[in-house]
Curated annotation (Swiss-Prot):
GO molecular function: 5S rRNA binding; structural constituent of ribosome
Role description: This is one of the proteins that binds to the 5S RNA in the ribosome where it forms part of the central protuberance.
Subunit structure as annotated in this protein's UniProt entry: Part of the 50S ribosomal subunit; part of the 5S rRNA/L5/L18/L25 subcomplex. Contacts the 5S rRNA. Binds to the 5S rRNA independently of L5 and L18.
Gene: rplY
Protein name (record): Large ribosomal subunit protein bL25
Pfam families: Ribosomal_L25p
Domain of life of the organism encoding this protein: Bacteria
Recorded family membership: Belongs to the bacterial ribosomal protein bL25 family.
An annotated GO cellular component: cytosolic large ribosomal subunit
């Protein structure tokens, strides 16, 4: 199955800005990989909460629509809230 997530590049980085994003129902994330610069991104929580329940989400290649260009990535790590059904941060690697 193919998954697509719309995202924007983050300009503010740090604990305070990440908390503000989470309170606004956004998920901070990063895309990294060998030979490429890491890119801090943000996307809506509703875009990922439902698709991450599928088993093939973690093993398939995702498409992130990043400010008009498509980037192929795979999920490396996902941080979740301790007891709420919230995703706090996602690490993606270039596919």
């Amino acid at each position: 199955m193919s998954y697509t997530i719309a995202a924007q590049v983050r300009t503010e980085i740090g604990k305070g800005s990440s908390r503000r994003l989470r309170h606004a129902d956004k998920v901070p994330a990063v895309i990294y990989g060998p030979g490429k610069e890491p890119v801090a991104i943000v996307f809506d929580h509703k875009d990922i909460i439902n698709i991450q329940e599928n088993e093939d989400f973690y093993t398939s290649t995702l498409t992130i629509n990043l400010d008009g260009s498509d980037v192929k990535v795979s999920v490396k790590a996902m941080q979740r809230h301790a007891f709420k059904p919230l995703i706090e941060h996602v690490d993606f690697t270039y596919a």
